[in-house]
């Protein structure tokens, strides 16, 4: 079964360390942005590790309606959202997205 969850990375505080999803039971991860860099927050966001071992931020490529598909073996992270801004728990500013996963084995 597909799993759907929302994520929020607040401005000035939100990030997620680099990882792959090889051991998580997912085959494919798809990420649907609900906020857009330079519109809803200034910097940071989704970055992937290339085959040449280079970290590439792909957030600026995404628009409303985009879907980013990642194989479970691709290393990725969320770079700190708005690292030059101070975190304010009363503001809901930052990076929002929906994430769904396709399991490696689908029971029928």
Residue spans for each PLM region:
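Catalytic core of Fe(II)/2-oxoglutarate
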Residues: 37, 41-108
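Conserved double-stranded beta-helix
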Residues: 1-39
